[in-house]
Amino acid sequence: MSAALAVTDEVALPIRAVGDLAAAAEVSREEVAVITQCAALGGKLPFEDASVGAVLAVIKNVESLREQLVAEIRRVLKAGGRVLVQSPAPSSSQKPNTDIERKLLMGGFAEVQSSAASSQDSVQSVTVKAKKASWSMGSSFPLKKTTKALPKIQIDDDSDLIDEDSLLTEEDLKKPQLPVVGDCEVGAAKKACKNCTCGRAEAEEKVGKLELTAEQINNPQSACGSCGLGDAFRCGTCPYRGLPPFKPGEKVSLSGNFLAADI
């Protein structure tokens, strides 16, 4: 397997050019394979993929450096390999080195640069150098994700902390006093018990004193002056509630069916 490859579109390749390629590739001259009249190969190079470390293309006509030939040079080069393209120096109106740089860039090469014109065998020529990427198609590498560290919270131990026990006073800690529940009987008809302490016995005594007597019925007397106007004007403790309106001093008489059921 050759360490370097030299191609040209001419019939022969100068020995000096082969020596320059060997020096650039850091190999001996015997390790350099030479292909002449590369245009006759139809753009195909009889080498395996990534098999040579450097390629020297001596091109007399820039049109010979076609896209297919550039792709083949890139195919046979190893990852990180270099390619050198030599062509006759351009005249003032022609710039073939610019076309070569563009073709190499379009072919996937990197670090494309042209050197100053040099003279070989009384012929001015320029050299365009380029490099194949150091990675190959299908290669992969893990991505290192940078994780942002959480900001550290500075806690000041000297800061004043509130004691929750100090928020309650002695009054708050005392057991609340429940309201006194009436100790009398409960039910539909509540009555004061014998030892009443809730005040129900006193209330019943006051109500008992308000019961109507025969004298009050025969000679009604109003303390507020509204008893004879009817229930709409009588107070809540009026003894005449339920009786029809009457005039002061008028005898109150009830019909015979007053206490009879309506049904």
Curated annotation (Swiss-Prot):
Q: Where does [2Fe-2S] cluster bind?
A: C184, C193, C196, C198
Name what cofactor the protein needs. [2Fe-2S] cluster; [4Fe-4S] cluster
- Enumerate the residue ranges of region (Fe-S binding site B): 224-238
Where in this protein does the record put region N-terminal SAM-like domain?
A: 1-141
Q: Motif Cx2C motif 1 located where?
A: 224-227
Q: Where in the cell is it found?
A: Cytoplasm; Mitochondrion intermembrane space
Disulfide bonding pattern of the chain: none
Q: Which GO terms describe its biological process?
A: iron-sulfur cluster assembly
Please list where the region (Linker) is annotated.
142-173
**What residue range is the signal peptide?**
none
GO cellular component, alphabetical, reads: cytoplasm; mitochondrial intermembrane space
Q: Which SUPFAM superfamilies match?
A: S-adenosyl-L-methionine-dependent methyltransferases
Instruction: Give the location of motif Cx2C motif 2 in residue numbers.
Output: 235-238
The entry marks the following residues as binding [4Fe-4S] cluster, namely: C224, C227, C235, C238
Which InterPro entries does UniProt cross-reference here? Anamorsin, CIAPIN1, Methyltransf_11, SAM-dependent_MTases_sf
Q: What UniProt keywords are attached to this protein's entry?
A: 2Fe-2S, 4Fe-4S, Cytoplasm, Iron, Iron-sulfur, Metal-binding, Mitochondrion
Domain comment as written in the entry:
The C-terminal domain binds 2 Fe-S clusters but is otherwise mostly in an intrinsically disordered conformation.
List the HAMAP family.
Anamorsin
Q: What does this gene product do?
A: Component of the cytosolic iron-sulfur (Fe-S) protein assembly (CIA) machinery. Required for the maturation of extramitochondrial Fe-S proteins. Part of an electron transfer chain functioning in an early step of cytosolic Fe-S biogenesis, facilitating the de novo assembly of a [4Fe-4S] cluster on the cytosolic Fe-S scaffold complex. Electrons are transferred from NADPH via a FAD- and FMN-containing diflavin oxidoreductase.
Q: Which family does it belong to?
A: Belongs to the anamorsin family.
Please identify the protein, giving its name as recorded.
Anamorsin homolog
